[in-house]
């Protein structure tokens, strides 16, 4: 498979088609946006500064694929991705999260992403170091060879001094190599050992109340560099010790300064922020009430989307080249209800179409992570073969579509609810089913859902 930087917009759309049904216009828009980023990197320096990303506004009801398109795109491109709800934020001066916290969160995600990549690169070396630490615990030097006590040295030092002969050293090395072989063969996985680990608990996190978590994290990070890291000894099995020690040893092998430098660059030039429910902060100008705060959030959001510098604990971050994708249903408000300056910062507008019954059929069958494929994989672990007939799939799609028309339209999410109810009995009885092949046809689907679908009140609560 090609690297992402070599993929054309058509190929990006084809990759997205593997997971998301329909919505071609939205896929095209995001594919062009990320391809333009790659093109920008190839420009001369003076032009690179001038070319800014074209932010996208997705308009469509819930459950049609807005978030999934952005998330899959970020995974495909290896970009730091953050999803936020516009309603989480409050105007500066009010209790709650300020909008610039989204940039700090994006940088944190970017740092963790780069750190994991670098740790993966040094994993083999880290495994060797973990093996040595486990052997140190399994074969401590003092236990492996008997000590020779020198009374004259004891008199001078005031304590016992251990001395080892060459023969003792040879025996110790032989014992250690023997244990190494057994360890590699997996014979010692259940042995209990005592290892020294660093404590990760933060003493400041419990002090601050709801809405103040960010402050607790910042203060904790500030003091973590000043206070020495506390270590404690823990008893655990060799298998558990390997999992605990591997990230600790890998972290020692990477250069955090380089990690932070690369992470900041990636966040600034490849970061994607998905702002959901932006329609909830849109509204006509009002002198009082909640609209004051909504207008304030929009005005606070404006400089970040336009391009500004936000201070983070890793250093300053420019937001000029971060791609912002905003989304909303816009049932009550319209995109034109956003303040004009913010509207201008989302020049690409894409309308996502509501899902049809045929779309539901395709969603159940086609994506690589399709719902029925997930259930088949889950129940195969119990030895149950789940077979969905064509009419069974169509019946599930028909019922989900009808429920969306009658009740609240929640898009493709309705399929999860319907599928869960259809397969509830099988999931419960799976370990005890004598017949390991189960066929889900239209009759079975109707039998499981008929009473609930017909009863309006039950449908509202259960489906």
Swiss-Prot record:
It holds the Pfam family AAA_2. GO terms for cellular component: HslUV protease complex. Keywords: ATP-binding, Chaperone, Cytoplasm, Nucleotide-binding. Its main location: cytoplasm. Gene3D superfamilies: 1.10.8.60, P-loop containing nucleotide triphosphate hydrolases. It is found in: Cytoplasm. ATP binds at residues 21, 63-68, 276, 341, 413. A double ring-shaped homohexamer of HslV is capped on each side by a ring-shaped HslU homohexamer. The assembly of the HslU/HslV complex is dependent on binding of ATP. ATPase subunit of a proteasome-like degradation complex; this subunit has chaperone activity. The binding of ATP and its subsequent hydrolysis by HslU are essential for unfolding of protein substrates subsequently hydrolyzed by HslV. HslU recognizes the N-terminal part of its protein substrates and unfolds these before they are guided to HslV for hydrolysis. This is ATP-dependent protease ATPase subunit HslU. The gene is hslU.
């Amino acid at each position: 498979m090609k690297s992402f930087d070599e993929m054309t917009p058509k190929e990006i759309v084809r990759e997205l088609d593997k997971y998301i049904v329909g919505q071609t216009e939205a896929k095209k828009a995001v594919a062009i946006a990320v391809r333009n980023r790659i093109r920008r990197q190839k420009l001369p320096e003076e032009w690179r500064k001038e070319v800014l990303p074209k932010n996208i506004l997705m308009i469509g009801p819930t459950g049609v694929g807005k978030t999934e398109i952005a998330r899959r795109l970020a995974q495909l491109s290896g970009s730091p991705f953050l999803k936020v709800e516009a309603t989480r934020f409050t105007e500066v001066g009010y209790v709650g999260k300020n909008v610039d916290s989204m940039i700090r969160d994006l940088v944190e995600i970017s740092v963790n992403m780069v750190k994991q990549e670098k740790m993966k690169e040094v994993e083999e070396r880290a495994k060797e170091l973990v093996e040595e630490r486990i052997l140190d615990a399994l074969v401590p030097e003092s236990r492996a060879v008997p000590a020779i006590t020198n009374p004259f040295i004891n008199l001078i030092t005031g304590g016992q001094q251990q001395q080892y002969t060459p023969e003792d050293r040879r025996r110790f090395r032989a014992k250690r190599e023997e244990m190494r072989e057994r360890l590699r063969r997996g014979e010692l996985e259940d042995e209990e050992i005592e290892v020294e680990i660093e404590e990760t608990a933060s003493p400041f996190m419990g002090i601050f109340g709801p809405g103040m978590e960010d402050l607790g994290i910042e203060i904790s990070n500030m003091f973590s560099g000043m206070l020495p890291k506390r270590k404690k000894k823990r008893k655990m099995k060799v298998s558990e010790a390997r999992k605990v020690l591997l990230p600790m040893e890998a972290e020692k092998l990477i250069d955090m300064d380089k990690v932070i430098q690369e992470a900041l660059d990636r966040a600034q030039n490849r970061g994607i922020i998905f702002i959901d429910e932006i329609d909830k902060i849109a509204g006509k100008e009002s002198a009082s009430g909640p609209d004051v705060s909504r207008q304030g959030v929009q005005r606070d959001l404006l400089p970040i989307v336009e391009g500004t510098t936000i201070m983070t604990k890793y250093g300053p971050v420019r937001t000029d080249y971060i791609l912002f994708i905003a989304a909303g249903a816009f049932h009550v408000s319209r995109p034109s209800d956003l303040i004009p300056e913010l509207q201008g910062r989302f020049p690409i507008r894409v309308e996502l179409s509501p899902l049809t019954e045929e779309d539901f059929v395709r969603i159940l069958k086609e994506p690589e992570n399709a719902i029925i494929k997930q259930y088949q994989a889950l129940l195969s672990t119990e030895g149950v073969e789940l077979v969905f007939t064509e009419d069974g799939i169509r019946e599930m799609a028909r019922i989900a579509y009808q429920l969306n028309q009658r009740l609240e339209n929640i898009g493709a999410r309705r399929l999860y609810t319907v599928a869960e109810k259809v397969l509830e009995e099988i999931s419960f009885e799976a370990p005890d089913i004598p017949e390991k092949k189960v066929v889900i046809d239209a009759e079975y689907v109707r039998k499981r859902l008929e009473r609930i679908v017909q009863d309006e009140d039950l449908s509202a609560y259960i489906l």
